[in-house]
């Protein structure tokens, strides 16, 4: 069935919208979107017209003057510097930007990124001891270090350290030579939303300003890449950086980014923040998840085109491996959920031996999308489970774990995502306790996802011009989400599945001017509920579809519901007719589910509606006549089973439910 969603339409404020229209000259739909994002005239002027000259003075960051003096002194003394990074895209890009910059200043600089599985996130004492033994004079952290008080304390007398980080600052700040973090309580820096690469970039700016008396604006495309990937609010400085970085990415990108764009098949596209988040960043992230993040840094700091091209291809292949690992674990997890039955009604908890810990967080996110419940995915190794958690709106997964801290080995995180470890023999106990916790805390309504809609649009008003006007709000991201619109009544002219695995759905709507295309990713089940002539309401974002020189609007479906649903009615005679059709369609061989469904819709008897005809497949699966499975290439298939003797329809739950 189509997953139910709560449709929430933003109320807007006509008076505020009129002020924005009058003062800023924006289109009414843009004014409505700005009001929905709580942007007033002053903020709106900066939001729409902000430039690189509006970036803040880096020296208003606490300890920046100390850090600049120490870095320049170390360079002038020809002493070795090590950048200590992190394995996610923010850490990779922060390492790359600072490394490239310090090389320009003539520094003796290298970088160190911990291995995800064996070392984990952040500073570790063993690595620092190794750097000290190598004769390192100065360590500069990027995207980490703010919570490493004890580790810094253990080495501070033997090595100079500068911490640059953007994570929430604890009460005990490490006693490094300098700590640059805009979230420190006594830091006067006005913008509190910088990413790790953003903080590293501010250090570069301060150093360049001291050396050359001008703004440093190189590598903005790399800074933009890390900023978008880390899902920080795209307002203030972040918006300016990403907007300028995207311009550079589309005009004259870093060689590594260019090759990454090429292998991702985006070389003919205008790169947007969406392309960064969904296509480029995962390829960099794959290195840290599956192999080692240093390869991603090498991609961004190497100038040899042949080497960079080879690394880009390698990262692309690593990403395929990551996708395959993720796909396999996801499928095993789905089977686990199905086998749990009602045990999975309130919280999704799945576990498997030797599941790759680098991808369990992604799998957890996919399971939340699928089942919309707080989700824990656990990889078991040597009797210990390492878990990754993702939550639903309004539910604090960290608090949920804290309620079970007595049976956890360790845990950490925040409201939306967390991690933990546990003895494998206590996973069932964890499931029982979290089920009880979720049952008490989460309401039935909160288990239904919300689709927030900015504005209604009549189907006949959608054209390329409105997309161009709305694009003034780009780049989109956290705190400036992609606008979502709704058509409250549209008629389906055609519907089809697309993609190699037939797992995406294309719908064509009727308009007074012709037709309007829409895409629903990973929604093959729509084919069973929406048909030619179905009248629906649909929530969507807008994008341009460019094909053979033609540009047209395209809807990217967020939610869709039929305004009326065909009733399912099953009869013995109707199923007999469908048995003949399906048998002829399959011809005793395996066929893709999509091909069989298409054949059913073409050949069904006139007295059966579409849903009833397609539901016959479920009856025949329950009777063992056909068997559903996934092919080696990931396609959903049906296998015909030759069964002798008479079958009893009352053994089919589906038939008993819908029989007339």
State each model region's role.
Residues 174-228:
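Short alpha-helices
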Residues 131, 154-155, 620:
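Generic structural signal for hydrophobic
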Residues 166-167, 182, 356, 414, ...:
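Histidine-centered active-site/metal-ligand motif
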Residues 87-91, 144, 166-167, 182, ...:
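Generic detector of well-ordered alpha-helical packing
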């Amino acid at each position: 069935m189509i997953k139910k969603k709560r449709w929430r339409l933003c109320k807007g404020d006509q008076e505020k919208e009129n002020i924005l229209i009058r003062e800023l000259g924006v289109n009414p739909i843009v004014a409505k979107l700005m009001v929905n994002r709580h942007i007033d005239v002053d903020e709106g002027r900066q939001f729409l017209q902000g430039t690189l000259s509006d970036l803040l003075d880096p020296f208003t960051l606490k300890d920046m003057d100390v850090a600049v003096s120490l870095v320049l002194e170390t360079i002038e003394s020809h002493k070795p510097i090590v950048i200590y990074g992190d394995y996610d895209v923010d850490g990779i890009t922060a390492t790359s930007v600072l490394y490239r910059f310090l090389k320009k200043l003539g520094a003796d600089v290298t970088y160190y990124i911990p291995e995800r599985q064996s070392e984990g996130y952040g500073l570790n004492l063993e690595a620092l001891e190794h750097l000290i033994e190598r004769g390192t004079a100065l360590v500069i952290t990027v995207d980490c270090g703010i919570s490493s008080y004890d580790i810094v304390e253990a080495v501070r007398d033997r090595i100079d350290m500068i911490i640059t980080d953007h994570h929430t600052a604890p009460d005990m700040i490490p006693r490094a030579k300098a700590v640059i973090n805009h979230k420190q309580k006594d830091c006067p820096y006005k913008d509190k939303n910088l990413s790790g690469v953003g903080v590293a970039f501010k250090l570069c700016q301060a150093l360049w300003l001291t050396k050359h008396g001008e703004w440093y604006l190189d590598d903005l495309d790399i800074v933009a890449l890390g900023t978008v990937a880390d899902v920080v609010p795209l307002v203030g400085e972040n918006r300016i950086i990403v907007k300028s970085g995207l311009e550079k990415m589309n005009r004259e990108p870093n060689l590594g980014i260019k090759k990454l764009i090429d292998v991702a098949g985006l070389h003919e596209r205008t790169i947007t923040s969406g392309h960064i988040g969904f296509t480029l960043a995962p390829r960099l992230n794959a290195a840290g998840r599956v192999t080692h993040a240093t390869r991603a840094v090498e991609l961004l700091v190497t100038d040899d085109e042949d080497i960079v091209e080879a690394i880009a291809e390698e990262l692309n292949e690593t990403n395929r491996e990551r996708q395959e690992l993720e796909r396999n674990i996801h499928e095993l997890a789905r089977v686990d959920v199905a086998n749990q039955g009602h045990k999975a009604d309130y919280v999704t908890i799945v576990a498997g031996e030797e599941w790759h810990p680098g991808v369990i967080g992604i799998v957890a996110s996919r399971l939340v999308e699928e089942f919309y419940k707080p989700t824990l995915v656990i990889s078991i190794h040597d009797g210990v489970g390492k878990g990754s958690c993702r939550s639903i709106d309004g539910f604090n997964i960290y608090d949920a774990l804290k309620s079970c801290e007595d049976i956890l080995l360790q845990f950490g995180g925040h409201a939306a995502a967390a991690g933990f470890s546990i003895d494998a023999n206590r996973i069932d106990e964890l499931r029982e306790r979290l089920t009880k916790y979720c049952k008490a805390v989460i309401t039935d309504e909160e288990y239904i996802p919300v689709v927030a809609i900015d504005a209604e649009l009549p189907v006949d008003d959608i054209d390329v011009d409105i997309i161009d006007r709305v694009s003034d709000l780009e780049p989109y991201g956290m705190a400036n989400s992609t606008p979502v619109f709704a058509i409250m009544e549209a008629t389906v002219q055609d519907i089809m599945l697309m993609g190699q695995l037939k797992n995406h759905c294309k719908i064509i709507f009727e308009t007074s001017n012709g037709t309007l295309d829409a895409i629903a990713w990973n929604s093959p089940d729509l084919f069973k509920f929406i048909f030619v002539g179905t009248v629906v309401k649909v929530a969507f974002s807008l994008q341009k579809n460019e094909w053979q020189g033609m540009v047209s609007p395209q809807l990217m479906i967020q939610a869709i519901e039929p305004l009326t649903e065909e009733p399912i009615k099953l009869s013995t005679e109707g199923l007999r007719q469908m048995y003949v059709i399906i048998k002829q369609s399959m011809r005793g061989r395996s066929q893709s589910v999509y091909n069989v469904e298409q054949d059913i819709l073409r050949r069904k008897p006139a007295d059966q509606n579409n849903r009833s005809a397609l539901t016959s497949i479920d009856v025949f699966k329950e009777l063992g006549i056909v068997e559903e499975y996934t092919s080696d290439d990931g396609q959903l298939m049906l296998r015909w089973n030759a069964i002798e003797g008479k079958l009893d329809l009352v053994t089919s739950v589906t038939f008993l439910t819908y029989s007339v």
